[in-house]
Amino acid sequence: MNIPEDLRYTKDHEWVKLLDDGSTALAGITDFAQSELGDIVFVELKAPGTKLKAHEVFGTVEAVKTVADLFAPIAGELVGINEALDAAEVVNTDPYGEGWLVKIKVDDAKAVEELLDAASYRQLIGA
């Protein structure tokens, strides 16, 4: 199970990476989440400009097995979505790279640091 050390994680199996500008973050689903979902066939996300509250639903992932809600890992404004998601299988093949989901202008960068670190996330999923 791939759990990069430089990311932060939620109990809902999303990851967050604060970008170098310190106010924007990328977010996606974890390797664990994509493996549990199975083959992802479609991703639906709210539009850029949407204000997000932490833990609020911001989209859905449709897999062969199921449809799952996506929860905002942090509060902020959704400022971008990954255009590569037209080929939704990229979430399965590269969940931490090309398969990122959204870019968020964060309300509070410190909130990212309050999320789970890699060791805590490993413990959560029993890895």
Curated annotation (Swiss-Prot):
The keyword Membrane does not apply. SUPFAM superfamilies: Single hybrid motif. Residues 24-105 form the Lipoyl-binding domain. The modification N6-lipoyllysine is found at residue 65. Keywords: Lipoyl. It comes from the Bacteria. The glycine cleavage system catalyzes the degradation of glycine. The H protein shuttles the methylamine group of glycine from the P protein to the T protein. The glycine cleavage system is composed of four proteins: P, T, L and H. HAMAP family: GcvH. This is Glycine cleavage system H protein. It comes from Chlorobium phaeobacteroides (strain DSM 266 / SMG 266 / 2430). The lineage of its organism: Bacteria, Pseudomonadati, Chlorobiota, Chlorobiia, Chlorobiales.
